[in-house]
Structure formats: structure tokens, C-alpha cells
């Protein structure tokens, strides 16, 4: 999924239509990738990983705009499942 497609999905999720926020949202996508990588997850170009980045970026946006926003359980579970599937994968070698 391209960054532009990811940005479009993020804007739809957040119900934002103005292009004025595009640079900020693009930086949130970059930050989301960095935060996910910091948790030990190696992202791929798959749609499921792209959607994980989108969910995390949406969480970052909502956390900044509202008080006391906790990480949604579905996002925490998705991160944990992705990490566990990566760590549990059998590699040749």
C-alpha cells in the first residue's frame, strides 16, 4: 500500500476531508511506523501491516486531540498478535 493510499484511509477513519492536515497526518504515519518498529515488529508491505500503521496513526491523532485517550484494545491486541506471529515464525537456517 502506498503512503498516499494509507493517508486516504487514515483521513477516512478520522473523518477528515481537508487537505490542510495532510502534512501532519503524513508525519503521524511516519511516527506510527517508528513506534511500531520500536516495539520490535518488523513491518512488511502487506495490507495487514499497513492497516496496523493506520490504526496506530489514528490513535496518535486522537490521543493528541483528546484528554486521557488510552490505546484501544484492538490496537494493542493487533500489535501483540503481530509481534507474537513474527517471533513464533519458523525460519530456515
Where are these regions (language model features)?
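Domain-level detector for trafficking modules
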Residues: 65, 69-78, 82-84
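Conserved short "hinge" loops at termini or chain/domain junctions
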Residues: 1-52, 62-65, 83-93
Amino acid at each position: 500500500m502506498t503512503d498516499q493510499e494509507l493517508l486516504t484511509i487514515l483521513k477516512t477513519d478520522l473523518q477528515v476531508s481537508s487537505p490542510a492536515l495532510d502534512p501532519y497526518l503524513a508525519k503521524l504515519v511516519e511516527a506510527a511506523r517508528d513506534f511500531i518498529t520500536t516495539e520490535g515488529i518488523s513491518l512488511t508491505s502487506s495490507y495487514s501491516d499497513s492497516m496496523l500503521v493506520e490504526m496506530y496513526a489514528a490513535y496518535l491523532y486522537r490521543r493528541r486531540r483528546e484528554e486521557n485517550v488510552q490505546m484501544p484494545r484492538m490496537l494493542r491486541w493487533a500489535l501483540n498478535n503481530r509481534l507474537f506471529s513474527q517471533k513464533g515464525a519458523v525460519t530456515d537456517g
